[in-house]
Amino acid sequence: MDNPLYYVGIDIAKAKFDVAVKLQNGKHKHKVFKNNPEGFQTLMQWLNTFGETFHCVMEATNIYHEALADFLFQQQITVSVINPKCSANFTKTDNLRSKTDKIDAKMLADYADEKRHKLPIYQPISPAQRELLRKNRQLDHLKKQLAQEKTRLTMLVDSDCIASTQQMIVFIKAQIKALEKTIKQCVNADNTLKNNVKLLCTIPAIGFATAVQLIAHLGDGNRFKNAKAAATFAGLTPMIKSSGKSLNTVIGISKIGQSDIRKALFCPAMNFAFGCYKNSVYRSFVLRLLECGKPKMVIITALMRKLVTIAQAVLQKQTAFNLDTFMK
């Protein structure tokens, strides 16, 4: 082969990243680089000593992978950003007994080679979507803090500690209110975001906050090729078990996906399945599952998946929700 394809595993951290290139003979070449623009350029110089065609694989690690993934994409290198759970399962099947950054980089290169036809191809999100995603994550963090402080308040007896915690609760509430206002301004300042939020809000069970969460992760509808891919990304696809006489038994959902989407959709799905909005457009869908003897949690999860697939279709088609089109 004149121009062989090299699989590259990248184990990335805050300050540096380990890179392992899998050679044609199955061995690996390893090197460490700084996680900054200078390190990215040095990486490119090193990769060019092997060839011209690469497929780089890295795990989604907070925000540490984003700059490098964007840089490699700009260099026209194929990049895959995978869920850490996928590589963790691969590590177990590969019987790796040690765990170091170097070993992890080699493992990711092997993972890329073995799963070459199933790897998701990385597409950078727009600056507006990235800003929305980061603000939304901060909002989720503040809400968790607020819940924790409220729980602590019920366990305190010292008056000074109670007063301190109450002040903290007031402060966090103010921060949440200010950030929610900023998120609305962020949406209104971008015509694409504004239009997509408006479209998603036409879906029963989807309000502004849920629409923002969905757009922050799903994008404008072009990130995934179809609704099934979006549901897979959200970790809402069925997990099938096939062993012995138990063939193709559904044992739950995969949960290998974006948990923020599942959290955002749980309450809306619960309310529209069994709560105050149970006589909604989803009633026939829910009744059909009840008649099949499905438990409540299974039905709620199924409706969550339904909402994701509808949201993806609405964004992809750039069409408002229509009962005849989206509930066939």
Task: Describe the residue ranges of each PLM region.
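Gly/Thr-rich phosphate-binding beta-strand-loop-beta motif of the actin/hexokinase/Hsp70
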Residues: 2-22, 108
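Short, glycine/acidic-enriched loop or turn micro-motifs at the edges of active sites
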Residues: 14, 62, 86, 216
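Short, basic/hydrophobic alpha-helical segments
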Residues: 38-55
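Short glycine-rich phosphate-binding loop at a beta-alpha junction
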Residues: 53-64
